[in-house]
């Protein structure tokens, strides 16, 4: 395979630093904003650590952050949440890795599954609460047909980053100007993604 794309935090089962680059766990007001995360990434050593993470995973991949957005919603619930006891009664679809573990650590039954499996799982009762993204993408999935209580600003995805990946051998075979073009395209995608989400 020559390339691909995914959300950076999907790699957190392979390397815990993937959460730092993809979806730091800390909600608004206590964690990094998208703007402060990008300042760290581009101007304060974050990019070098991102490249090091890929080297340490040994996957023969060159990654590029391409989509920086957030914050995401806490999610959809059958009944209002007025306390942690209310929250803990749900089987809650969460992202994999550290976000899911964080919810488990506070007593929430965290279940990880792909986006396309969420609505069928809600309809079958396999889960009874879910998060995916934010209002527009969530409405496309149709969660509002099953769940009526929606809470914005989640604990887990204040900054959300997606990547593009190039097979390491393919990347090494590119001319310098092609590698430079990949860097420029990545930065342009970040800018476009931010303006699209504003």
Task: List each model region and its residues.
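N-terminal secretory/targeting leader peptides
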Residues: 1-37, 52-198
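Active-site-adjacent segment of FAD-dependent monooxygenases/related oxidoreductases
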Residues: 37-43
């Amino acid at each position: 395979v020559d390339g691909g794309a995914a959300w950076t935090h999907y790699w957190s089962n392979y390397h815990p630093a993937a959460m730092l680059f993809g979806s730091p766990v800390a909600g608004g007001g206590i964690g990094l904003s998208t703007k402060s995360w990008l300042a760290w990434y581009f101007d304060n050593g974050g990019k070098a650590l991102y490249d090091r993470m890929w080297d340490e995973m040994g996957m023969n991949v060159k990654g590029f952050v391409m989509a920086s957005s957030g914050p995401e919603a806490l999610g959809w619930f059958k009944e209002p949440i007025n306390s942690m006891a209310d929250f803990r009664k749900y089987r809650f679809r969460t992202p994999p890795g550290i976000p899911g573990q964080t919810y488990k650590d506070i007593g929430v039954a965290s279940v990880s599954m792909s986006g396309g499996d969420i609505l069928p799982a809600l309809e079958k009762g396999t889960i009874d609460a879910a998060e995916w993204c934010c209002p527009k993408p969530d409405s496309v999935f149709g969660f509002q047909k099953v769940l009526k209580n929606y809470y914005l600003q989640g604990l887990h995805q204040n900054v959300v980053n997606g990547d593009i990946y190039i097979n390491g051998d393919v990347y090494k075979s590119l001319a310098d100007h092609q590698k430079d073009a990949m860097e420029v395209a990545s930065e342009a995608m970040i800018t476009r993604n931010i303006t699209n989400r504003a």
